[in-house]
Amino acid sequence: MGAELCKRICCEFGTTSGEPLKDALGRQVSLRSYDNIPPTSSSDEGEDDDDGEDDDNEERQQKLRLCGSGCGGNDSSSGSHREATHDGPKKNAVRSTFREDKAPKPSKQSKKKKKPSKHHHHQQSSIMQETDDLDEEDTSIYLSPPPVPPVQVVAKRLPRPDTPRTPRQKKISQRPPTPGTKKPAASLPF
């Protein structure tokens, strides 16, 4: 059961046999607690014990070949694990087909290289980095541009015409200035 679970996890998350498994928070996960769980399928109940053991050994070896070296040694089954990982050309052939199935995965990494993340100051798992990159892309679309500093608007006054427009304004401008009043603004130079 542990080898089957190990194979499923390796295939699902794309980890290689030498890397330790990590959860979403980057902590290492151990599968040793799943090694001794008996299989839940009921197909072995009606068969003879001798035939069932041979089938189980062949099936276990095949699963271990697919899984590589047991996902970094987390599979602590007996000698069949050691025999299965030292198959030579068979193991390499199975691994090469396994890697070909995972060929689309590197394209995600190439996207990551094109758009480098700003958060390279600490180590993260690849899943967390991909989600961070996606979050940055999504939020950058909705962010407004930086505020533009206000432009200094200098009010320029146009000079007033020398002659008043109305007859009343003419009359007022012709009066001599009194000590309490100021000269009209039209006569002040700017």
From Swiss-Prot:
GO cellular component, one term: viral tegument
Species of the source: Human cytomegalovirus (strain Merlin)
Similarity field: Belongs to the herpesviridae cytoplasmic envelopment protein 3 family.
Protein name per the record: Cytoplasmic envelopment protein 3
Entries under InterPro entries matching the protein: HSV_CEP3_betahv (IPR034705)
Chain spans, region Disordered: 14-190
GO biological process, one term: viral budding from Golgi membrane
Membrane topology, from the record: Lipid-anchor
Alphabetized UniProt keyword annotations: Host cell membrane, Host Golgi apparatus, Host membrane, Lipoprotein, Membrane, Myristate, Palmitate, Phosphoprotein, Virion, Virion tegument
UniProt lineage: Viruses, Duplodnaviria, Heunggongvirae, Peploviricota, Herviviricetes
Biased composition regions of type Basic and acidic residues, renumbered to the chain: 80-90
